Amino acid sequence: MFPFYSCWRTGLLLLLLAVAVRESWQTEEKTCDLVGEKGKESEKELALVKRLKPLFNKSFESTVGQGSDTYIYIFRVCREAGNHTSGAGLVQINKSNGKETVVGRLNETHIFNGSNWIMLIYKGGDEYDNHCGKEQRRAVVMISCNRHTLADNFNPVSEERGKVQDCFYLFEMDSSLACSPEISHLSVGSILLVTFASLVAVYVVGGFLYQRLVVGAKGMEQFPHLAFWQDLGNLVADGCDFVCRSKPRNVPAAYRGVGDDQLGEESEERDDHLLPM
């Protein structure tokens, strides 16, 4: 009796465990399934999906049209949009009747990028009724670089359905995640300034140590070439005077002075005619 009871308990536990695992698997949220066999996806695409991970928990909406032709587009990055049962990454909802159309699904995701943009494509949407050879819909989301926002400005751009095949819905969105990493580098002026400051520091410290340890100087005399720096102002003034002046400083006078001994006695009658009569 005991072996049978033990087997029955073990079987019940295994059954409950299987049900729990199944429920957990069903409730687990779907994510992007890149094109290609499992484990053989492009490493570049996997890196781009990881790069967009901060957007996984965000949902984006945009409303277009008017009246009975008003549609709401709901988009999520590598997460289910809409009713969470169709595996859709982007859906279209007719506002007048609430009909939901899957534009693209997560299980057919393709992603690539350029210098300042990322292109996310969801394929496998609901089939067209009369357009594009009744092929499945496809969503193309162009994520452009905008360093001032994590994600914003999700808007539909156009729907290309005038072709026999390869039709698509085009959307755009801004995100800082699409921007290339900023490469910080010093300008030429900064490099020269750093170099000059380094040379000055080496000169002052090295000269100070030399004056103190080798020469045995004390106080202000430890500063290297102290006499030169004290007289620098005069040297600069002399140099400016030499460069800027066009004539020598001591120019001989163009006239010669007359001494008192060379002056004759003036006649007192010279101005008599100016006196009033």
UniProtKB/Swiss-Prot annotation:
One Pfam family it belongs to: Man-6-P_recep
Residues bearing carbohydrate: 57, 83, 94, 107, 113
Primary subcellular site in the record, as a coarse category: membrane
Domain of life: Eukaryota
Residue intervals on the Cytoplasmic side: 211-277
Chain intervals for the UniProt region annotation (Disordered): 256-277
An individual GO BP term: endosome to lysosome transport
Subcellular locations according to the entry: Lysosome membrane
Topology with respect to the bilayer: Single-pass type I membrane protein
UniProt keywords, alphabetically: Disulfide bond, Glycoprotein, Lysosome, Membrane, Phosphoprotein, Receptor, Signal, Transmembrane, Transmembrane helix, Transport
Keyword field contains Lipid metabolism: no
Membrane-spanning segments: 186-210
Disulphide bridges, residue numbers: 32-78, 132-167, 145-179
Start and end residues of each MRH domain: 30-181
Other facts: This receptor has optimal binding in the presence of divalent cations.
The protein's name: Cation-dependent mannose-6-phosphate receptor
A GO cellular-component term linked to this record: membrane
